[in-house]
Each structure stands twice: as C-alpha cells, then as structure tokens.
Amino acid sequence: MLDSKLLRTATEQVAKGLAKRGYELDVAKIQALEETRKAIQIKTENLQSERNTRSKAIGKAKQAGEDVAPLMQAVESIKQQLVDAEADLARVQTEWDEFVKAIPNIPADEVPEGKSDEDNVEIRRWGMPRSFHFPIKDHVDLGADLGGLDFDTATKITGSRFAVLRGGIARLHRALAQFMLDTHINQHGYEEVNIPFIVNRDSLFGTGQLPKFEEDLFKLTDDREFYLIPTAEVPLTNIYRDAILEDNQLPIKFVAHSPCFRSEAGSYGRDTRGMIRQHQFEKVELVWLVQPEKSDEALEALVAHAEKILHDLELPHRTVVLCGGDIGFSAAKTYDIEVWVPSQNKYREISSCSNVRDFQARRMLARFRNKETGKPELLHTLNGSGLAVGRTLLAVLENYQQEDGSVIIPEVLRPYMGGQEVLAPVKQ
C-alpha cells in the first residue's frame, strides 16, 4: 500500500510513476476526497470550538443565576452536529482507504519502460541449449513413457490442471525440492520455516493478494474466510505482521517448501498441456525482510541464490528485468529467471524475484527499530521462487532426455536418489 501522505502531497509525482506500469491514477478523486476531508475537518474543529465556548457560557450563566436552557439546547445541537460530522469523516476515510488499497506499487526508477513481457530486458544468460540429434519429446510424453506422469488420472480424481506423479518421477520431484532447500539453508544462510497452507484474509491483504485478486484464490467454503495459499510468500511475510523487529535481527531470510494453489482465473486456454500452469504445484520460496537502504542489494543476492540452483543442475537459463507494464501489483522491481524448455524452443519463467519495498510492510505494519533514532520504521520485504519445483522437474526431464526415452539424473540430485543415475522407460 502506498503512503497516504505521499499520495496527498505529491500526487502528480505518484501519477507519473504509476504511469510507467500503465496505471492511470485518479487524480481528480484524490483531490475531491482530500477537499471533502479538509472541509469536514474544519467544520469539526469549528463545532468543537463553539461547543467549548457555549459550555463555558453555561457555567457563567449558572453562576449569575440566568436561564441556561437556550444555551443547553444549543450545546446539544452542536453535539449532534459533531456526531454527524465525525460519521461523515469516517465515511470519507473508509472511501479513501478502499481507494488506496487498489493502487499498485510505484515501479523503481530503473525499471524499463514497456507494456508487456515482450518489452522485458534480458540482462544475462547462462549455459547453451543442447543440440539434439534425435526427435525430442516434451515432458508430458517423456513422463508417460517413464510411467510416472499421469494427467488423465488427475483429471478423473479432481479436474484439469492437476497431475499425479509416481515412482521415479515422484522421487525426482522430491529430490529437487530437498536439493533446493539444502542449498538455500547450507550455502545461502536461510532459515527453514514450515508454514500453514491455509491463511486468513488479513494475511492475504498484507501481501497484496486481497482485495484485488480474490478470483485467483481458492477459498474454503465455510464462514471463517480461510484461503489456500497461492504462494508461501503469504505466510512467511506475515510472520512479522504487527511486529517491531530490532535492527540487529535483520536481515531475516526465510525459506519454505510448500504446495501452492491458484485458480488461474485469467489463464483460460493458456499452457493447457503439461505442468507449466497447474492449479496445485510446489515451490521453494525465499523471503527477505531488511532495512530500506539494503533492499536493492538484497534483491541482487536473492536472484543469485535462485540462479545458483539452475547452475548446479546445469540447466540453460536467462535472467530478465521486467518492464513497468509487466511487474506485479505489489512489486517495485522484478527479475524473472527463465529456463530453457527444448520442446517449446524457448525460455519459460521458473522464478520471479521482487523487491516490494515498504508496500507490503505498510499493509502489515511490519517494522524495525532504527538503531540511530530509536524509532520504528517500515521494513522492506522481498520474495522470490527458489525454484518452482514442477517447472524445474519438466526442465530436467526435457533437457536430460536421451534417444531411447530415458532421462539422465543430474549429478547433484543423485545423492537424493540413492545413487540412481538414470530414469528408464517402462516397458509396455
């Protein structure tokens, strides 16, 4: 959530910043609400002053033995006017709050101009896509031949955009998640957290999914307003909602492996085949909480940590910085890491890493105590995938496939697979 004071005092500057992401700030509404608020505030202050003056006059009239009934009536009238004015002020404040909740974050100055993912800017590549001397298969056909990836059964059990993983592929999927966790914990210094997979509205508001993106969420059908998490970012970041951390506790670096649940309401007809876009998938999530002056540096470190997983798996990938028109609602700056998918002959997103600055912290009232001033200040929060496990699985299957339909297991995963080196096709 943006700073209300900034919106009121630097409206044109904010509007210019938001225009980079293609968002048109309703400047007229801000001005109208502010004028109304000020008018009611002035009216309230005048009524309070008049009430105080009349109250003093009543005291003097009583001492003089005069009739105070007219003065009492006037004071009662003023009290009712004050009640009405305070109610009007509350209504204006509610309208303002709802208005501000729907405004996205301001992109960082260095975020490139652009309207869509076509305008994102590649900043580096790692590895060369493999040249195959045989007709390649996609992960759906490979998984079926390996006897471990079954979309038809998942559709029978639940519906479309779900998968059943079995045998070696299920084990490989688990190995990937474990490898990611171990790397981030042992090499990058993250604290592992086992989090709830169900959260309340306050948590989803804190990280920016609510109220704007409710249709993308799976909601439990009872009166408690619980939701399945769309990402572990939600519970991880909310750990310090309504909290004040000491400066020496920072940075906070959390990692969690969890299922994620998304309705994909706006993705009808997109990526309907395979594991690219699922209603349920697993992800290893990275979350940072830092002092404001350290968040830019933290974002670069977070991205490097996610890239390290792909380096170790020897999967070709590239990193792009998202343009203003493609960054998410809460983000000030985002890098996407895209892995090479041979069957599609292109790079596909496998991680999105964002600096949210104080946008979430203001919604959550997540703060730290500045060691210089001793006063609480808003934290900066960051998040990123380290990585999406299902998409990493499909990248391994496709990039490591062999002509006979087998799949070589990446060397770094073999200790998690009991030393197994190859997934072999199931004989029909």
UniProtKB/Swiss-Prot annotation:
L-serine binds at residues 231-233, 285, 385. It comes from the Bacteria. ATP binds at residues 262-264, 349-352. Pathway: Aminoacyl-tRNA biosynthesis; selenocysteinyl-tRNA(Sec) biosynthesis; L-seryl-tRNA(Sec) from L-serine and tRNA(Sec): step 1/1. The keyword Aminoacyl-tRNA synthetase applies. Transmembrane segments: none annotated. SUPFAM superfamilies: Class II aaRS and biotin synthetases (SSF55681), tRNA-binding arm (SSF46589). InterPro entries: aa-tRNA-synt_IIb, aa-tRNA-synth_II, aa-tRNA-synth_II/BPL/LPL, Ser-tRNA-ligase_type_1, Ser-tRNA-synth_1_N, SerRS_1_N_sf, SerRS_core, tRNA-bd_arm. One of its GO terms (cellular component) is cytoplasm. Its EC number is 6.1.1.11. It catalyses: tRNA(Ser) + L-serine + ATP = L-seryl-tRNA(Ser) + AMP + diphosphate + H(+); tRNA(Sec) + L-serine + ATP = L-seryl-tRNA(Sec) + AMP + diphosphate + H(+). One of its GO terms (biological process) is seryl-tRNA aminoacylation. GO terms for molecular function: ATP binding; serine-tRNA ligase activity. Keywords: Aminoacyl-tRNA synthetase, ATP-binding, Cytoplasm, Ligase, Nucleotide-binding, Protein biosynthesis. Pfam families: Seryl_tRNA_N, tRNA-synt_2b. It is found in: Cytoplasm. Belongs to the class-II aminoacyl-tRNA synthetase family. Type-1 seryl-tRNA synthetase subfamily. Consists of two distinct domains, a catalytic core and a N-terminal extension that is involved in tRNA binding. Catalyzes the attachment of serine to tRNA(Ser). Is also able to aminoacylate tRNA(Sec) with serine, to form the misacylated tRNA L-seryl-tRNA(Sec), which will be further converted into selenocysteinyl-tRNA(Sec). Homodimer. The tRNA molecule binds across the dimer. This is Serine--tRNA ligase. It comes from Cellvibrio japonicus (strain Ueda107) (Pseudomonas fluorescens subsp. cellulosa). The gene is serS.
